[in-house]
């Protein structure tokens, strides 16, 4: 049995609770719509994440195959020298955007791809295979950065969905039922009081009439 709220069983309290129930039902409807929309958005992004994860895995495999070919072409020692001469890539800038009020990361992943001059090994004797290897790993970097953004977005959306679900369930299964049960209790109490008052007045009237006739 649903527990009732600890309130005075008065008509004023009854009206106040009825207003609270209407507000709670409206809030429940809004939160349920938000929850449903968040779930739809989550699965849309989830599908994108799965596709991107496959692309990342394929690109990583391709990058290591290019690295193997470059090592065969110039040798491990030369390849190590070239790697040590490469300049650091651009810094990643993390901004923020909102998805239905949920703050999620926005990572600027442009500008990772560079030419040999920007990488810093243009004047070192190298080979086209080294360039292809560098380009492929830069593509990996772009994809991995994008994947990190999407996966963090999914984590935050999942957290918000769970939070919203708890609020929806609290309203649906605890708060609204308790208020409704309390309204029922107060209504029954007031009806009982009205009946008692009616019979009391009826008895008083009968006594007064009997006294008047005697």
Curated annotation (Swiss-Prot):
Pfam families with a match to the protein in the record: ATP-synt_D
Location within or outside the cell: Cell membrane
Membrane topology: Peripheral membrane protein
GO-annotated biological processes: proton motive force-driven plasma membrane ATP synthesis
Keywords for the protein's UniProt record, in alphabetical order: ATP synthesis, Cell membrane, Hydrogen ion transport, Ion transport, Membrane, Transport
GO molecular-function terms, A-Z: ATP binding; proton-transporting ATP synthase activity, rotational mechanism; proton-transporting ATPase activity, rotational mechanism
InterPro entries: V_ATPase_D
Lineage top rank: taxon: Archaea
NCBIfam families: PRK00373.1-4, V_ATPase_subD
UniProt xrefs under PANTHER family: V-TYPE ATP SYNTHASE SUBUNIT D
Stated family: Belongs to the V-ATPase D subunit family.
Binding partners and assembly: Has multiple subunits with at least A(3), B(3), C, D, E, F, H, I and proteolipid K(x).
Function comment: Component of the A-type ATP synthase that produces ATP from ADP in the presence of a proton gradient across the membrane.
Protein's UniProt name: A-type ATP synthase subunit D
UniProt organism field: Thermococcus sibiricus (strain DSM 12597 / MM 739)
């Amino acid at each position: 049995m649903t527990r009732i709220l600890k309130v005075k069983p008065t008509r004023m309290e009854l009206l106040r609770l009825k207003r609270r129930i209407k507000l709670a039902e409206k809030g429940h409807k809004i939160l349920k719509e938000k929850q449903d929309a968040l779930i739809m958005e989550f699965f849309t992004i989830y599908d994108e994440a799965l596709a991107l994860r496959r692309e990342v895995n394929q690109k990583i495999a391709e990058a290591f195959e290019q690295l193997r070919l470059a090592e065969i072409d110039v040798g491990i020692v030369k390849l190590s020298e070239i790697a040590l001469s490469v300049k650091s890539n651009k810094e990643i800038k993390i901004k923020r955007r909102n998805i239905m009020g949920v703050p999620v990361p926005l990572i600027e992943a442009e500008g990772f791809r560079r030419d040999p001059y920007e990488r810093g090994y243009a004047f070192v004797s190298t080979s086209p295979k080294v360039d292809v290897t560098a380009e492929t790993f830069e593509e990996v970097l772009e994809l991995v950065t994008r994947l990190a953004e999407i996966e963090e977005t999914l984590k935050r959306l999942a957290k918000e969905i769970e939070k919203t679900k708890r609020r929806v369930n609290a309203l649906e299964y605890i708060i609204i039922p308790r208020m409704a049960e309390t309204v029922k209790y107060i209504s029954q109490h007031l009806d009982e009081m009205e009946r008692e008052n009616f019979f009391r007045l009826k008895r008083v009237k009968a006594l007064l009439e009997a006294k008047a006739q005697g």
